[in-house]
Amino acid sequence: MDLKSRAETFLTTIVNRRETASIEHYLHPDAQFKHNDLPSMSTAELLAFWPQVLDESPDFRVQILATIAEGLRVWVYSRVEGRLGKGVMDDVHMLEFDGNGLLIRSRGIQREVVEEMEK
């Protein structure tokens, strides 16, 4: 299974395509999601919370720049823009999958940068 593609699809689907419901089949029912500025969330909490983020972030988009996979872990480095009204940010997501390719743990870290995203 190509976990790099799964990780990239997960991120671009929930951000650029804005399709929260269509990621559910990628998620383990007991998954945990942690983002540097938010409390930990379960799968159900993420699926309920994410549409609110999208509603408050009409210009939110992600540009994946590099993806590295090792075993069941995938690291994705991206540039994001427009999340909750913020500017351009470096974004690193560390994603861990189970043996069936379901996302079981996600940790996202972001920091603001001065540069603009490539158009």
Curated annotation (Swiss-Prot):
Pathway: Mycotoxin biosynthesis. GO terms for molecular function: isomerase activity. Its EC number is 5.-.-.-. Gene3D superfamilies: 3.10.450.50. InterPro entries: NTF2-like_dom_sf (IPR032710), SnoaL-like (IPR037401). Keywords: Isomerase. The keyword Protein transport does not apply. The keyword Cytoplasm does not apply. GO terms for biological process: ochratoxin A biosynthetic process. Probable cyclase; part of the gene cluster that mediates the biosynthesis of ochratoxin A (OTA), a mycotoxin composed of a chlorinated type I polyketide dihydroisocoumarin moiety linked to L-phenylalanine, and demonstrated to have nephrotoxic, immunotoxic, genotoxic, neurotoxic, and teratogenic properties. OtaY is probably involved in the polyketide cyclization. Belongs to the aurE cyclase family. This is Probable cyclase otaY. The lineage of its organism: Eukaryota, Fungi, Dikarya, Ascomycota, Pezizomycotina.
